[in-house]
Amino acid sequence: METCLMRCSHGGIALFRALKPPRNVKLPNSLRLSSMALHTDGGRSVKRAYDALLLDAGGTLLQLAKPVEETYATIGSKYGLSMTSAEIKQGFRRAFAAPWPEKLCYQGDGRPFWKLVVSEATGCADDDYFEEVYEYYAKGDAWHLPDGAYETIVLLKDAGGHIHKVFSSICYLLVLMKSMVFELFSSFIIPNMMSCDTVKVAVVSNFDTRLRKLLKELNVLDLFDAVIISSEVGYEKPDIKIFKAALDQLNAEACKAVHIGDDQKADKVGANAIGVDCWLWGIDVKTFSDIGNRMLISES
C-alpha cells in the first residue's frame, strides 16, 4: 500500500500543485483519521498505545546541567555567600516547603517567587546576586535534554507522517476533481490508511515565561504541537484545567493521552484526575527510549 501510494503520488502531487487548491478547502468528515492506528516502521507493524504525549518540563524534559546548589554557591561566592552546597540544598527544601501566599507560584516571569526562594535558600537578599542566578537559568546552557529525548519525540511525531503527506495530497486532488474514483478510494483505501496521523506531543509545565526561550535555545520548541505553561494559562498542576488546556489544543481525548512527569502530586494526581494516564519519570519510565517503547507497540 505504502509503495503504491508513493509511486502514484509523483504524478498526482504535480497535478495537485497545478490546480493550486485554496488553503481553506476542507475534507469530508469521513476522511478524518481515527486513533490507535497501525503503521509500518522499517517493515515492522507498530500500534500506537496513545494518541497524545504530555511532557513536564523541569525535572523531566529539562535536566539541570549542574546541581542547583553548586551553581548557587559558585555564583554566590562573588557576593560574599559562604554557605556550602549541602547547606544551600537544605535551604531549598525549606524554601519550597514554605507556603506561598499567592494563587500561582509562577506569574509572568516568576521573579517574585524565585526571589523569595533564593533568599530563603541562601540567606542572601542581594538583588544583583538574584539577577545573575535568574538570568543564568534563563539560558539553554544551564539545561540539557535527557539522552534520546529529541530522537524519541521525532520518532513519535513521524510515525506514519510520510504517508500522511502523500495521503492528504491525494485526498485533496480527488475532492477537487470530484473524481468518480473518490467513492472507491473512500470505501476501500481509507479504512486501511488509519496510520496517517501521528502522535501529538505537548509540554505541560508549572513554569514561568522563560520556558519558551529555553526550549528554543535547546532546538526543540518547534517539535511540540502545544506548549502549555502555568504562568500563561493561569493554572498550575495538579489543577485539571491545565491538562484540559493541553488536551483541547491537541484535540485529544483524555483516555488516549499519557503524561510524563516527576512529581507524584502535581503530575500523577493531576493527570489521573482528568482521566489521563501518568508515568512518573525515574520510576515508571527512566529513559525516553522507555517512553518510545511504551508509546509504540510492535505487532506480532
Regions found by a protein language model. Give the residues of each.
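Asp-based, Mg2+/Mn2+-dependent phosphohydrolase catalytic module
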Residues: 2-51, 86, 128, 150-159, ...
